[in-house]
Amino acid sequence: MSKDLLLEIGTEEIPAHYMPSALKQLHEGAADIFAKNHLDYKDIRTVGTPRRLALLVTGLAEKQADVSSKNKGPSVKIAFDADGNPTQAAMGFARGQHIDVSELVTEDGYVYVDVTVAGSETKALLPEIMKKLVSSLAFPKSMTWGNEDMRFVRPLRWFVALFGTEVVPFEMAHVVSGRTTRGHRFLGTGDFDIQAPGEYVDLLREHYIIVDPEERRDMIVNGLHAVAKKQGGHVVMDEELLEEVVYLVEYPTPLYGCFDTDYLELPEAAVITPMKDHQRYFPLRDSEDRLMNMFLTVRNGDDYHLDTVRHGNERVLRARLDDAKFFFAEDRKKSLADRTEDLKRIVFQDGLGTLFDKSQRLAAIMTFLTAKLDLPVEEGEIKHLADLAKTDLLTQMVQEFTELQGVMGREYALLDGEEPETAEAVFEQYLPRFAGDELPHTTLGLLLSLADKFDTITGSFSLGLIPTGSQDPFALRRQTIGVLNILIDAGWNINCDEVFAYILEVLGTDRNKREDVIASLHDYFVLRLKNILQDAGFDYHIIDCVLQGDSMNAAEIVKRATALRDSEFSTQEELLQAYTRVANMVKDAQNTDVDDTLFETEEEKALYAACLAAEAELPQAYAVYDYRCAVEILGRAVSAINNFLDNVLVMHEKEAVKNNRMNLLTRTLGLISPVGDIKKLS
């Protein structure tokens, strides 16, 4: 027998960006706690609005499943005497298990008792389960309220807890569970009761609460498209903004608004950013993809008095756009190049100087990278780009709308008559800005982005500002992942440790500290690269194999991992198995001197010939980081390796022959060592 379960946690408005995680936690927490309590169910669903988090469970068993187990006792020798009679040990064990000694069973030389624990009634367990689910929810920030000691994201106002038609009684923060919920703040008719979980979603809809986020999303998307079409345009659908709006409203109604066409003379970013990031409005474009002097927004309510709402939204946006127009006009009075000296007034970071100091370091780091990578970039280009890189941070537009850093830098650079690639690089230095964002694609943009991130990361580590746990105030994790993804995508082969060392020299870091700082940076980058490889689906054996070694060359490491994964040999078979067998034989042996006059078998000769052939071809493949070719060459020796190990006794009675065979294997293992530590595949 089973019943449906409902838990609704009623609160003050929860921040929109907390909601997806909270609903996911509630879903996973319920599944976990039901499993631990041996409670079967058909389905779990979580829904919610800014004022409520709800758990809906269908087919929850009315009783725990019985749990059977075997409790192990003393050995048979101790439990029974020579005549098979139970000893004091057996009787004591039986007594402790609350059974007669005759019920003991023997298995594997020990006595056991079969124990079955009858399941409890679900309704008796649910009050505690409900409280655990509520208290288990974690948020980036929480609060206390009134005289309560309990912390939660926002004050708790009501609980609905139903198992079937019965209320699950519990109390938290002086809020007692019941069946009464609340409708829309303005459209609803007050509190109302839920009689059973199955009516929850539909009954809330009648009171102007669209509790299912997916239903709200569909209403918003369809409504926005319909309004946009009616106004002769199409909506610029931003998924991040859409997700936020879904969790800002309980009953969505899309509407449009207008603004003066004069504002369209501003750079698009200066119009869209105040609209989207500050007002949560969606821009509109016409059939030729030009920005229109219109916007779409979503009201938390019905279509009553929409004109009044529209005018209010237009008035707020007009003030924002007036500010943007003023900032733009003021900024255009001075070129970016004329702002370079002003960078000396702005501290970049305590201990790392001003933005001017940073721009000087950027020039030095870009020059270093250019030389290492042998790129066709003039030193004058680098110096000029470094001078411009941070100057847009001094503009009023960026100081007001900080998310426009780089974006307005590109716009202003183009208006100043800078080369397009230089302007693009000013923008690209901040890429990627988030997971999945685009990467720089111009040479100057790649150099500046890497230099900027390398400088910030290395400088922070030199000051001991290393991310720990959830604390990462300077976004070093994101920047590290950005560096690695840029290097991998560009295929630029450079040892990051060398970059760290150079930057520490430029910073003037104490020489006695540098080695430790580089080691910390190396380990930090290795861990981030490991995560990237895992996310890309690489087998953990391959990851461990290629991450061994002193060099932190991300592009080269990924090439090695890809070559191992994509070779015609299976990860667990042939090539890797063959070389792993060699590694297990060699262990820590170092000598690779082979005397072919000591060979006694054809297998030795064949392996030596295969080894020489590979040694002739591999250096060229390794020199150009062509690991696909290298793996193919290594594969040609597999047959000879297996024949040798299957048919030749390495530990020969003659010391010279034994050592020579071991040296041959050591030399064979050396063929694959540039690819990775094959012992990690054991």
Set out the residue ranges of the language-model regions:
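Amphipathic alpha-helical "coupling" segments that flank catalytic cores
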Residues: 1-682
